[in-house]
A protein has these predicted regions:
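Long amphipathic alpha-helical segments
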Residues: 110-179
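N-terminal interaction modules that seed assembly of large macromolecular complexes
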Residues: 53, 58-124
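Acidic, proline/glycine-rich low-complexity IDRs
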Residues: 159, 174-234
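Polybasic, lysine-rich low-complexity intrinsically disordered segments
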Residues: 7, 13, 19, 26-27, ...
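Charged, amphipathic alpha-helical oligomerization/scaffolding segments
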Residues: 67-74, 93-100, 104, 130, ...
């Protein structure tokens, strides 16, 4: 079976360019990814002549993989500029972007790692904290929410208080490490990055994303209804 391949470095470069050019308008977020993946069979063969018969490395250039890389890069770019938006814009955008990230993660191929070495991590404790604090200040009193889908619930009869900012920083950490590994352009490293990201999605950040999405939905629509009721009372 012939798989579509794309030059990952060019994809990431194009994604960064699109991100810089895109304006995140109020109540609007467009993620233009489709044009990135249509290449001819001749282009595919010429770009990756050494990988044509290598099934293990083929997953790096699968369409589903490239689409996930693109959305992941979009997510990281937006998170890194989260302080430039007001709370409503931030919540509205994530309510569109997070479901797309979850959907594309589900499409990642299931494979095994090639190397036994630990993959490099790029997100530092300082950068993690800067992002978490930025989001926490942006969401203010709406940052905390009650959650029952956490491991600690087995020891408690009441919901656990969680933080949207911490959840998003956790998701960002996994996704940013993944995107950074892809930017290295080393097939074996990219292959193992896919495997690790897929495993972490199933075990950690996938559930965190769903929980956070519920909390963001509550902020977006419950807050709006409460404000409308207050206007009526006045």
């Amino acid at each position: 079976m012939r798989h579509e391949r794309q030059n990952i470095s060019n994809v990431l470069k194009l994604t960064r360019t699109q991100t810089q050019m895109r304006r995140y308008k109020k109540n609007e977020y467009h993620c233009h990814i489709a044009p990135l993946f249509f290449v001819t069979s001749r282009q595919i063969k010429n770009q990756n002549p050494d990988n044509v018969n290598n099934e293990r490395e083929d997953i790096v250039f699968l369409r589903d993989t490239v689409e996930f890389v693109t959305v992941a890069a979009e997510f990281c770019a937006y998170m890194e500029h989260s302080g430039e938006h007001n709370r409503k814009e931030f919540v509205d955008t994530l309510l569109k972007l997070l479901p797309l990230l979850y959907l594309k993660a589900q499409m990642l191929p299931n494979e095994e790692s090639i190397s036994d070495d630990n993959l490099e991590e790029f997100v530092t404790e300082d950068s993690y904290e800067v992002l978490r604090i930025t989001i926490s200040e942006l969401l203010a009193e709406k940052d905390s929410y009650l959650d029952v889908f956490v491991a600690d619930m087995k020891y408690s009869d009441t919901p656990i208080t969680k933080s949207i900012s911490e959840d998003l920083a956790d998701i960002y950490q996994d996704i940013k490490n993944f995107v950074s590994l892809f930017q290295l352009g080393i097939n074996e490293t990219m292959h193992d990055a896919i495997v690790e990201c897929n495993e972490h999605f199933k075990q950690y950040w996938g559930q965190t994303l769903v929980n956070t999405l519920r909390a963001l939905h509550d902020i977006r629509y419950k807050t709006t209804l409460e404000e409308e009721e207050e206007d009526i009372d006045e």
